[in-house]
From Swiss-Prot:
The family this protein is said to belong to: Belongs to the ZPR1 family.
Domain of life per record: Eukaryota
Assembly notes: Component of an import snRNP complex composed of KPNB1, SNUPN, SMN1 and ZNF259. Interacts (via C-terminal region) with SMN1 (via C-terminal region); the interaction occurs after treatment with serum. Interacts with elongation factor 1-alpha EEF1A1; the interaction occurs in a epidermal growth factor (EGF)-dependent manner. Interacts (via zinc fingers) with EGFR (via C-terminal cytoplasmic kinase domain); the interaction is negatively regulated in response to epidermal growth factor (EGF) stimulation and EGFR kinase activity. May also bind to the PDGFR receptor.
Disordered: annotated segments: 1-43, 438-459
Composition-biased stretches (Low complexity): 1-29
PANTHER family referenced in this protein's UniProt entry, alphabetically: ZINC FINGER PROTEIN ZPR1
Gene Ontology BP annotations: apoptotic process involved in development; axon development; Cajal body organization; cellular response to epidermal growth factor stimulus; DNA endoreduplication; DNA replication; microtubule cytoskeleton organization; mRNA processing
Name listed for the protein in its UniProt record: Zinc finger protein ZPR1
Species assigned in the record: Bos taurus (Bovine)
Cited InterPro entries: Znf_ZPR1 (IPR004457), ZPR1 (IPR040141), ZPR1_A/B_dom (IPR042451), ZPR1_jr_dom (IPR056180), ZPR1_Znf1/2 (IPR042452)
Zinc fingers (C4-type) by residue: 51-83, 259-291
Length: 459
């Protein structure tokens, strides 16, 4: 059953009028401030707007903010003092991500209903057990909870029921039965599955067990189809042909992009690098002159390997922290002693040292907004402090631990200081990928031979 009509009542929030109340300066180089209840300078911009309910002037408040560990968003709230109508929504202010994202959550307990959810306009929400779907662009973006998503769908289905009962009583009865099923889900009498599929990659579902792995939540990153690219207003660019005499291995290429920290225009340098005893990779480094943020990312310069690679390294000495490390986008990281797992695509591709990778993990976990401030619980804070202490002990060489890199594409690498001899503390395994791993890499439907057959004849 589709919930195309499951939209909150009312028309779009407002039609902006020319007059606007002045807002405080968010600070040099930072248009989007991190969301914080303690930041007194973070004030909304007030704009006098036309109320689409009574056609008199109301007030729209816009707050440009950034959720740490996530994206920039615009929170808007409209209220009309004349008729009392109000409306709130959020919009993603960040860039469309390189890949789409699919969150599959198995709801087993009432605690799962309280998970924070960021759902953008382009996200599709499904509950397979009820054959229920909220299509993309049928609802405004929302910062809510799992229970809030279901309540919003119920409200959308109930809003036209009086009219249906008068004109189509049979249809209204079926919708009443379906609404009752949705209300039963809120009681979590039995487990059900919630899927949020966002081609833009800007939706988010909270992991309340961070920094530990969430067994109830599966996050899948995927490449968009041409139809999804068109739906998002993106235009695929054809790859440029490279002249035969051109050799870019000794050149540093430059192109314009946006800073991932402040979203200001920045310049990215790109170069092909040959890693000893491994393969060729592409290193991209961005330096923002506006806010001073620096970042680097690594892309594989070759194809997907025939076999996946799992590298298990036993950290026994502080000198191990200096080993070079290449983590591709398809590589997951696990530290069993900390019960910690870093999924694919998190942190992106990186060419750093083992010490740099562990510090990035610590920064990633400690800046999780749902473990900070008023939204955190004492138990979460204690777990986070214990995790940080153990990670510091590993960095200082006090605590021995295993560092596992699992890359189904086989494009990750950890330096062997004994090369070409074997490293006694490192185990490298090559394995055959599963069907699901090939599906995630887009290999199952790839046709490399005989693809010319079946194509329409050219005139």
């Amino acid at each position: 059953m589709s919930a195309g009509g499951a939209v909150e009542p009312g028309l779009p929030a407002a039609a902006a009028a020319p007059s606007a109340a002045p807002a405080r300066d968010p600070g040099p180089g930072h248009l989007f401030r991190p969301i914080s209840a303690e930041d007194e300078e973070q004030q909304p911009t007030e704009i006098e707007s036309l109320c689409m309910n009574c056609y008199r002037n109301g007030m729209t408040r816009l707050l440009l903010t950034k959720i740490p560990f996530f994206r920039e968003i615009i929170v808007s709230s409209f209220s009309c003092e004349h008729c009392g109508w109000n409306n709130t929504e959020i919009q993603s202010a960040g860039r469309i991500q390189d890949q789409g994202v699919r969150y599959t959550l198995t709801v087993r307990a009432q605690e799962d209903m309280d998970r924070e959810v960021v759902k953008t306009d382009s996200a599709t929400t499904r509950i397979p057990e009820l054959d229920f779907e909220i299509p993309a662009f049928s609802q405004k973006g929302a910062l809510t909870t799992v229970e809030g998503l279901i309540s919003r769908a119920i409200s959308g289905l109930e809003q036209d029921q009086p009219t249906r009962r008068a004109n189509e009583e049979a249809v209204a009865e079926r919708i009443d039965e379906f609404i009752a099923k949705l209300k039963e889900l809120k009681q979590v009498a039995s487990p059900f599955t919630l899927i949020i599929d966002d081609p833009s990659g800007n939706s988010f579902v909270e992991n309340p067990h961070a920094p530990r792995k969430d067994d109830a939540l599966v996050i899948t990153h995927y490449n968009r189809t041409l139809q999804q690219e068109e739906m998002l207003g993106l235009q695929a660019e054809a790859p440029e042909e490279k002249p035969e005499e051109e050799d870019i291995r000794n050149e540093v290429l430059q192109f314009n992009t946006n800073c991932p920290e402040c979203n200001a225009p920045a310049q990215t340098n790109m170069k092909l690098v040959q890693i000893p005893h491994f393969k060729e990779v592409i290193i991209m480094a961005t330096n923002c002159e506006n806010c001073g943020h620096r970042t680097n990312e690594v892309k594989s310069g070759g194809a997907v390997e025939p076999l996946g690679t799992r590298i298990t390294f036993h950290i026994t000495d502080p000198s191990d922290m200096t080993r070079d490390l290449l983590k591709s986008e398809t590589c997951s990281v696990e530290i069993p002693e900390l019960e910690f797992e870093l999924g694919m695509a998190v942190l992106g591709g990186k060419f750093t040292t083992l010490e740099g990778m562990l510090k990035d993990i610590r920064e990633l976990v400690t800046k999780n907004p749902f473990t900070l401030g008023d939204s955190s619980s004492p138990g979460q804070t204690e777990k986070l402090q214990e995790f940080s202490q153990k990670l510091d002990q590993i960095l200082e060489g006090i605590l021995k631990a295993h560092f596992i890199m699992d890359d189904p594409a086989g494009n990750s690498y950890l330096q062997n200081v004994y090369a070409p001899e074997d490293d006694p503390e490192m185990k490298v395994e090559h394995y055959k990928r599963t069907f699901d791993q090939n599906e995630e890499l887009g290999l199952n439907d790839m046709k490399t031979e005989g693809y010319e057959t079946g194509l329409p004849a050219q005139r």
